[in-house]
């Protein structure tokens, strides 16, 4: 697989789970002989929801909730066939969304 890169984009709500999964992917890729660029932290997407505290009156009393989506980007440069096999068999934590582009 000369001259080819694998781009992996990870998303999760919990940054600790995301960083652990990133470390696992990096160690697997390095162990099989590929070089890794990253992890690059991408901007965190923050969604805020504002709702009334009471169900009926008191419009001024509100509560805000937010949902943060953390993202990381990894590039695996010149992957070997062993790297691809190891990444396919890798079992990541629940709650981590993985997008892979060749």
Curated annotation (Swiss-Prot):
The keyword Plastid does not apply. Gene3D superfamilies: Ribosomal protein S10 domain. It comes from the Bacteria. One of its GO terms (molecular function) is structural constituent of ribosome. InterPro entries: Ribosomal_uS10, Ribosomal_uS10_CS, Ribosomal_uS10_dom, Ribosomal_uS10_dom_sf. GO terms for biological process: translation. One of its GO terms (cellular component) is ribosome. SUPFAM superfamilies: Ribosomal protein S10. Pfam families: Ribosomal_S10 (PF00338). Keywords: Ribonucleoprotein, Ribosomal protein. SMART domains: Ribosomal_S10. Belongs to the universal ribosomal protein uS10 family. Part of the 30S ribosomal subunit. Involved in the binding of tRNA to the ribosomes. This is Small ribosomal subunit protein uS10. It comes from Allorhizobium ampelinum (strain ATCC BAA-846 / DSM 112012 / S4). The gene is rpsJ.
């Amino acid at each position: 697989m000369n001259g080819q890169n694998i781009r992996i984009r990870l998303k999760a709500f919990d940054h600790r789970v995301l960083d652990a999964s990133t470390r696992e992917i990096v160690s697997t890729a390095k162990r099989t002989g590929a070089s890794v660029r990253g992890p690059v932290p991408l901007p965190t997407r923050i969604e805020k929801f504002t709702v009334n505290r009471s169900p009926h009156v008191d419009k001024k009393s509100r509560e805000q909730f937010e949902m943060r989506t953390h993202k990381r980007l990894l590039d695996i440069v010149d992957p070997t066939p062993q790297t691809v096999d190891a990444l396919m068999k890798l079992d990541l934590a629940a709650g981590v969304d993985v997008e892979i582009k060749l």
